[in-house]
Amino acid sequence: MNAHFANEVQYDLTRDPSSPASLIHVIISSECLAAAGVPLSALVRGRPDGGAAANFRVETQTRAHATGDCTPWRSAFAAYVPADAVGAILAPVIPAHPDLLPRVPSAGGLFVSLPVACDAQGVYDPYTVAALRLAWGPWATCARVLLFSYDELVPPNTRYAADGARLMRLCRHFCRYVARLGAAAPAAATEAAAHLSLGMGESGTPTPQASSVSGGAGPAVVGTPDPPISPEEQLTAPGGDTATAEDVSITQENEEILALVQRAVQDVTRRHPVRARPKHAASGVASGLRQGALVHQAVSGGALGASDAEAVLAGLEPPGGGRFASRGGPRAAGEDVLNDVLTLVPGTAKPRSLVEWLDRGWEALAGGDRPDWLWSRRSISVVLRHHYGTKQRFVVVSYENSVAWGGRRARPPRLSSELATALTEACAAERVVRPHQLSPAAQTALLRRFPALEGPLRHPRPVLQPFDIAAEVAFVARIQIACLRALGHSIRAALQGGPRIFQRLRYDFGPHQSEWLGEVTRRFPVLLENLMRALEGTAPDAFFHTAYALAVLAHLGGQGGRGRRRRLVPLSDDIPARFADSDAHYAFDYYSTSGDTLRLTNRPIAVVIDGDVNGREQSKCRFMEGSPSTAPHRVCEQYLPGESYAYLCLGFNRRLCGLVVFPGGFAFTINTAAYLSLADPVARAVGLRFCRGAATGPGLVR
């Protein structure tokens, strides 16, 4: 819950009134994280106690519907609880009294908060996506991105109504625990338990409380013990709130109060009608009940007898003053205003409700209080949701005292699903599957109500497929296909007219290795074919971990940064920050040459090539410095490109000039940038999703 607290404070401090938005607290289940490829052991590594300290990083991003626009990646507070994630907020634990609130064990989860963009009326686009990047290391292989469309993220309503039973059960568990402690319980806890028992009655239903309970009386514990608090029961119990019900209840309560006030005013008016003020009366300003009565008495011209004064000033004398001690003649309207003593009565420190008595007893038992304990002792809404990408569960949490979505202190505008409802109704009316299949008249009507649909409905070539829940996944696959197509074209172009493969990287060979060189030369075509098959068979997520994909990102980020103070660099640290400082810096992936051709490197190997690889002379290469000494090393990382007979190497520089290196340093060059054709909006969308801004300059350290 502390992560939710921190995100809420950050959201409240950085909130921009000109950009309406909301915040949603979620608990992503361990099953959902594991299905997304997150190793749970990495989230608790070095934390044997499973504490709140995190050794991972979480960032969030908002991705607009169809346009490809994204907000920059922003850090968010997060905490992983290995077990009882939902139970930790429904039944918190006092360290000195771990048996206070029994609960049914449940799964762990990640506490985090996601921003939700909306318009001034709170209307959000259900196809907008909230992206969450969880990284447990600096490498691309140590990060996963989870995507949540607003349609699956924002619940229809809260479920505070389902929490009433938990609060009553919490009170009863407290009473029984204090009764078991007996004389060892603090006096304040015993008194609170007695009040709670009296207020709940034998049936557990709140009953009117007596005016006082003897401090020496113990709590009356009756009935059978309550079952432990069950998170699963809470998630599946009926009791969903309705937006109209909450509004109606508040409206009815206000109307009842206003009706009572109106009746009281009418009654007073009938007894003491307001009379016209004489023109000769002195002017005066009255504040408070007694001043108003004095002014009314002075200017009304009515009788000034004791009975009349009794009626006018009954109960309104200043504290400590005798009633009508002076029976003198009439005074000016403002004469006695300064003699009226206005006092501030301090609020009583005595609890006035069962919840406040629970607060008193809890503080006495725990020796203090914490914000998360306080929020757990108030109403909590937990809504079970399902993640589209992993088909696993996550929970949307709302706290009564929260300013995030569903909180009773949430600031306007309130999130509205009006757009999602309108799209569903329009498609149902015309019996079409997707909104862009609607008739022109229906689309125009939607655009008049929701101008934000201009891009998805009217753009001739949207960056992402509109009205598609899987548009982000399809976009990544489309970029991978474009990159592979460009690589294939560049390799074919380089080998047309007879291959020019010679030893571009210098290595010395002995006479006994001539037979081996002939064997490698004979296998060149097979190795190339297997290399392309290995790349084509790479999953989209894994493809963006390769040296080729990272070089593409660096290339696009450098293009987007021309004329600007900042450029885009890949999110991970797989390639050194100074990779983009020189055309001589290359990032290589190594592939096996025996058996199946597989990529052997977890991250690219960065080298510096001294010399012109495009010329006829031989060049030399060396490793780039700056690799962390704590990074795990594979055997292949000990060899330079072409140095070992076991590896086929594919590398690129910042301009996407590639080098295919066979064993022995035999290589040919390719110009992949000439065949990679991405429209500017598409290239920008790729950069925003896979990169972050960084200040330009040589030797940049991110």
Swiss-Prot record:
Keywords: Capsid protein, Host nucleus, Late protein, Viral genome packaging, Viral release from host cell, Virion. Residues 200-244 are annotated as: Disordered. Transmembrane segments: none annotated. One of its GO terms (biological process) is chromosome organization. It is found in: Virion; Host nucleus. The keyword Magnesium does not apply. Residues 210-224 have a biased composition (Low complexity). GO terms for cellular component: host cell nucleus; viral capsid. InterPro entries: UL17-like (IPR007640). The keyword Signal does not apply. Interacts (via C-terminus) with capsid vertex component 2/CVC2. Belongs to the herpesviridae CVC1 protein family. Capsid vertex-specific component that plays a role during viral DNA encapsidation, assuring correct genome cleavage and presumably stabilizing capsids that contain full-length viral genomes. This is Capsid vertex component 1. The gene is CVC1.
